[in-house]
A protein has these predicted regions:
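Alpha/beta enzyme core
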Residues: 18-82, 87-195, 201-221, 232-235, ...
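N-terminal basic/disordered segments at the start of proteins
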Residues: 1-13
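A short, acidic, flexible beta-alpha connecting loop/helix-capping segment that sits on the rim
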Residues: 223-229
Length: 244
């Protein structure tokens, strides 16, 4: 078994499904309600139903893996500017080396893949490059598909095409936003697909049930979790929707 195969098996060890809590938002937004103390939040959820966490390099290094028992740890490996920037970036660049990911013993690395912008080809080249670099050290890559035109992030054609393109360029798993015909995303993608959360949604449990019925193998939610009034209850409901 290769390093990639071993890590992919670990990602999907819980019945072939993956439930990630995404706490990487401050890389873009800085201060965020609910993420005032990420290390303590992670530790408080070590016995919850979540399978693991998505963290930026700085927080990743501050959280001892032993403190979160057997949870999966995914390293955020790309950057596209902050909320204070004057333009939306058409390309997200790798900022965490494969050596760093290996040193931290990351189970996978998450990178953003922006499609349809003025630097579309550059974005493709960057994704292919980082996939090659991480694969050299046996580390899987999760590509999160983003539309350069943010209003199209829920467009079926954009999501399905972006997922397939990312897989063709080397991604081992896709993180994709909800779209009406989600089965088109999963049926055309040769690698596992998990659902991206996005803004808080009162009916998000129903959305999870729908995408799982259409082939999604997991979810990676942030604000729906860390800004929930009852985090444990929300996690339990989402886990139930994912696994039943």
């Amino acid at each position: 078994m290769t390093g990639i195969q071993r890590r992919m098996a670990r990602l999907l060890a819980n019945g072939g499904k993956l439930f990630l809590a995404a706490f990487d938002h401050p890389q873009i937004y800085g201060t965020m309600e609910g993420l005032e103390n990420t290390p303590e939040l992670v530790k408080s959820l070590k016995d919850s139903e979540v399978d693991g966490f998505i963290l930026n390099p700085g927080m990743f290094e501050r959280i001892c893996p032993k403190a979160v028992d057997d949870k999966v740890l995914v390293l955020r490996g790309s950057v596209g500017g902050t909320m204070l920037g004057t333009v939306y970036s058409d390309v997200h660049y790798g900022m965490a080396s494969a050596e760093l990911a290996a040193k931290l013993d990351a189970d996978a690395v998450l990178v953003m893949f922006v499609i349809g912008g003025s630097k579309d080809m550059e974005s493709e080249i960057e994704l292919a490059r980082v996939c090659e670099e991480y694969h050299k050290l046996g580390i899987p890559v999760i590509a999160e598909v983003l539309a350069a035109d943010y209003t199209r992030n829920n467009d079926t054609e954009v999501v399905a095409s972006g997922a397939r393109i990312a897989a063709e360029l080397g991604a081992d798993m896709i993180k994709a936003f909800y779209c009406p015909d989600f089965e088109k995303v999963t049926s055309n993608c040769p690698v596992p697909v998990i659902l991206a959360g996005g803004p808080k949604d009162a009916d998000i449990v129903s959305v999870v049930k729908e995408v799982v019925s259409k082939g999604a193998v997991g979810l990676a939610f942030g604000r729906n979790i860390f800004q929930s009034k009852d985090i444990r209850k929300t996690i339990g409901e989402l886990d139930g929707a994912l696994r039943k």
